């Protein structure tokens, strides 16, 4: 089915609505959306997807929730003009994630001042975090602490890069110590727990192999290929 799209943006609201509401509020975005919907409906068009975007997370979320209370047209969700990558990822995860957990949102867009490919990766990660996407690896890792005896940050980054395009619906744990690591990650399909110059590979919380540190990553990736 081909959908027509209505895109309302807080930066380009009609002056009449800005005068009425004072600034681009959620109510102003929703009113603008319904005005455009009415124009399409008068022409017999009802297959429409609506987007109401703002660079302010609470406004975007409130607009989508208010719109959903009033009708059931499909909604495209996303925070616009999010800024640098770090800020943009946080804003997008907050806004899109909040709505997805409410059951709101039919299509999404992560807007970043970066390579558009990174927007796609971020969108997939948000869907996975919300429990709506099963494909792809879910990596869990612990914060570093006094028990960490390996380059945990470097190892996590290596695992992430190596599995970026893996579509297996598995959870991989990268833990900094063998004290709490296996227990904290027992729900993972497979993982690493580091020791002092060595580490172990575990599956479902059970140790399956003990190796020198430099062999951990290759061994982990080899086992993942066989899953």
List where the protein language model places each region.
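Short, small-residue-biased leader/transition segments that mark boundaries at the very start
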Residues: 1-2
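ATP-dependent carboxylate-amine ligase
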Residues: 143-147, 170, 211-219
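Conserved, mostly hydrophobic/aromatic
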Residues: 6, 50, 99, 142, ...
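Catalytic alpha/beta core domains of metabolic enzymes, predominantly
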Residues: 9-12, 17-167
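Hydrophobic alpha-helical bundle architecture
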Residues: 155-182, 186
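Terminal leader/tail segments of proteins
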Residues: 186-187, 193-197, 204-227
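Short, small-residue-rich loop/turn micro-motifs
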Residues: 8-10, 195-196
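Active-site proximal loops enriched in glycine and acidic residues that flank catalytic Cys/His/Asp
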Residues: 79-81, 112, 143-146, 174-178, ...
């Amino acid at each position: 089915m081909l959908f027509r799209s209505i895109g309302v943006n807080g930066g380009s609201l009609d002056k009449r609505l800005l005068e009425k509401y004072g600034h681009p509020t959620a109510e102003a975005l929703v009113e603008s959306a319904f005005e455009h919907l009415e124009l399409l409906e008068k022409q017999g068009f009802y297959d429409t997807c609506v987007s109401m975007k703002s660079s302010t997370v609470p406004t975007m979320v409130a607009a989508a929730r208010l719109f959903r209370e009033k009708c059931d047209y499909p909604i495209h969700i996303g925070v616009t003009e999010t800024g640098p990558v770090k800020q943009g990822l946080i804003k997008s995860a907050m806004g899109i994630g909040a709505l997805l957990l409410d059951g709101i949102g039919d299509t999404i867009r992560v807007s970043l001042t970066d390579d558009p490919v990174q927007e796609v990766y971020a969108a997939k990660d948000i869907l996975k975090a919300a429990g709506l996407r099963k494909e792809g690896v879910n990596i869990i890792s612990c914060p570093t602490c006094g028990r960490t005896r390996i380059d945990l940050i470097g190892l996590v980054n290596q695992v992430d890069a190596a599995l970026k395009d893996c579509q297996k619906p598995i959870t991989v744990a990268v833990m900094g110590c063998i004290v709490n690591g296996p227990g904290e990650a027992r729900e993972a399909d497979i993982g690493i727990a580091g020791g002092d110059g060595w580490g172990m590979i575990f599956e479902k919380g059970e140790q399956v192999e003990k190796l020198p540190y430099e062999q951990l990553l290759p061994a982990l990736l080899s086992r993942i290929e066989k899953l």
